[in-house]
A protein has these predicted regions:
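Active-site/pore-lining binding-face segments in mid-to-C-terminal subdomains
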Residues: 10-11, 284
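Sec-dependent signal peptide recognition
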Residues: 2-10
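Subset of outer-membrane beta-barrel
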Residues: 20-326
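Sec/Tat signal peptide C-region and signal peptidase I cleavage site
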Residues: 15-19
Length: 326
């Protein structure tokens, strides 16, 4: 009975999953997932980042999502000229029901940045992301009627559900714009971005329906960080996303304090709120060129009324390096 229940939950889950992309609370930890124009959008030469999200841990249909990105500027540092071109790669794995439904995404990103003023305080970037997605369903741990034999279920027998594995890979194109502003002393930094994912609305196949299309995802992002008096800083983060009938606003605030003599060493606390879904306390540490963040989702939607409270957490890591002195 439990396996039958898992099967129907998997079907319902997959119908919802194919209509929308995975999402993160700490969206700014792996920024290529929300806007390809963030490629190379940092002071150092190279950035490597990762985010692991475990969602609905206490349910029969847990979801885990892992993303890894690497991006950097192209060419050699020149004090008289900025390097406008950046390249990056993004890998994402989305795993539902302990491997029953798995999606793998591999993407290549590129961006071009122009300076809008002589002081180089304002910049505009355009980004492009080309992605390839492969999905599969594995029902090796779930029994079907066709597998019933003398003495019980024999999982080595065909399950008769060939359509479940009939999922073709697809490719898609995404693009975005990003505006950056910083004051002369770099104590105030702001960005605002717009992006559209899956512009070509690729065709997907699920079960016997070959008319499933991945809808476009529209995203708006904004981040503001301000260095306050002495050793304190504060930040505000906003993300709005809309895909088909699913839309939400994610808002975050944070405050940090410097520790030690290096101004890059900080420890901070924050709070995220995703409309109609969850609120998340957030802890992060910056040490030299590395950053680590941990957030925990507290469900505020109707899902909180279940027999067991649904638990979700995220762990993010980021490292930047190889910045050459001018």
């Amino acid at each position: 009975m439990k396996k039958i229940l898992q099967f129907f939950i998997a079907i319902i889950l997959c119908v919802n999953v194919i209509a929308q992309d995975p999402h993160y609370t700490q969206f700014n930890a792996v920024p290529l997932t929300v806007n390809p124009a963030y490629t190379g959008n940092f002071e150092e030469d190279i950035r490597v980042a990762g985010n692991f999200r475990q969602q609905w841990i206490s349910s029969v249909a847990p979801i885990s999502t892992t993303s890894i990105q690497a991006d950097g500027k192209i060419g050699y540092e020149n004090s008289s000229k900025q390097r406008p071109i950046s390249l990056g790669v993004l890998f994402m794995n989305d795993n539902s029901m302990n491997g029953t439904f798995v999606s793998n995404y591999i993407s290549a990103a590129a961006s071009y940045q122009i300076t809008l003023d002589k002081k180089e305080n304002q910049k505009l970037s355009i980004g492009l992301l080309a992605s390839y997605c492969n999905r599969r369903m594995d029902f090796s741990n779930i029994s079907f009627q066709q597998q019933f034999a003398t003495g019980g279920y024999d999982l080595s027998l065909p399950n008769g559900e060939s359509a479940l594995s009939n999922m073709k890979a697809y490719g898609c194109i995404s693009t975005g714009l990003l505006y950056n502003f910083s004051n002369d002393k770099k104590t105030s930094v702001f960005d605002f971005g717009l992006s559209v994912f899956h512009i070509n609305t690729p065709k997907q196949s699920f079960l016997k329906d070959d008319k499933q299309y991945l809808p476009m995802r529209f995203s708006v992002q904004s981040n503001y960080n301000r260095k306050l008096q002495d050793k304190f800083s504060a930040g505000i983060n906003l993300l709005y996303q809309n895909q088909a009938s699913v839309n939400y606003l994610l808002m975050g605030v944070s405050a940090s304090s410097q520790f030690g003599q290096d101004e890059k060493n900080k420890i901070g606390l924050g709070f995220w709120y995703r409309t109609k879904d969850a609120m998340s306390p957030y802890l992060f540490i910056d040490y030299k060129k590395a950053n680590i963040g941990l957030s925990y989702d507290i469900t505020t939607s109707d899902l909180k009324n279940g027999a067991k409270p649904l638990k979700s957490f995220e762990l993010s890591l980021q490292w930047r390096g190889f910045r050459k002195s001018k």
